[in-house]
């Protein structure tokens, strides 16, 4: 068994040191022995950890790159927009631990993959729906502490504001992975990031952290905001 050093860097998020100088992070396995996307399982003091691959997770990439504000923690209720096959939502569920993570996905085929890979994580609630239409799943999703968005649409920022108005608690947090090329392939990514940030601020968010996630994803920016619509 590999000898590793584990250190908590955020609540329920850990750095794992294999002694090779490479930066790695992990979450405690909510379902020990169960892989979701072929991730490495490691052990320290009889606790199983899932190594979080930043090449397959924008949130993982942001943490590796030095994210300062991580609002997802134990007990946090989360709405995850753009769940895909469940790679990042599975780690978010590990972190939230005893709280619900609503995982929204638009494509039925991908949702089936998500259910197959994550069905043993009882705090992960699959929701089939369109993030542009929060009213369609308002009978399923409760008020949440954090919204995480990874949706490759031209109106990414507007989608976040729309969902925040339906579901985000006052002074709750949102995290959004902005994909510049999904907004406009003709513009400089920096210009797009500034435009999307402006939409978020005008919609009711105070941006408290921004981090580029290259080299893991090209032309992507992670933003973290506090929701206080009444201030704007």
Curated annotation (Swiss-Prot):
Family to which the UniProt record says this protein belongs: Belongs to the methyltransferase superfamily. Fibrillarin family.
EC numbers for this chain: 2.1.1.-
Protein keywords: Methyltransferase, RNA-binding, rRNA processing, Transferase, tRNA processing
Root EC class: transferase
Residue spans crossing the bilayer: none
Subunit structure: Interacts with nop5. Component of box C/D small ribonucleoprotein (sRNP) particles that contain rpl7ae, FlpA and nop5, plus a guide RNA.
HAMAP family linked: RNA_methyltransf_FlpA
BP-aspect Gene Ontology terms: box C/D sno(s)RNA 3'-end processing; tRNA processing
Function, as annotated: Involved in pre-rRNA and tRNA processing. Utilizes the methyl donor S-adenosyl-L-methionine to catalyze the site-specific 2'-hydroxyl methylation of ribose moieties in rRNA and tRNA. Site specificity is provided by a guide RNA that base pairs with the substrate. Methylation occurs at a characteristic distance from the sequence involved in base pairing with the guide RNA.
Molecular functions per Gene Ontology: histone H2AQ104 methyltransferase activity; RNA binding; rRNA methyltransferase activity
Pfam families to which the protein is assigned, alphabetical: Fibrillarin
InterPro entries: Fibrillarin (IPR000692), Fibrillarin_CS (IPR020813), SAM-dependent_MTases_sf (IPR029063)
Protein name, UniProt field: Fibrillarin-like rRNA/tRNA 2'-O-methyltransferase
PROSITE patterns in the record: FIBRILLARIN
Alphabetical list of NCBIfam families matching this protein: PRK04266.1-2, PRK04266.1-3, PRK04266.1-5
Keyword Repeat among UniProt keywords: no
Binding site for S-adenosyl-L-methionine: 87-88, 105-106, 130-131, 150-153
Origin organism lineage: Archaea, Methanobacteriati, Methanobacteriota, Methanomada group, Methanococci
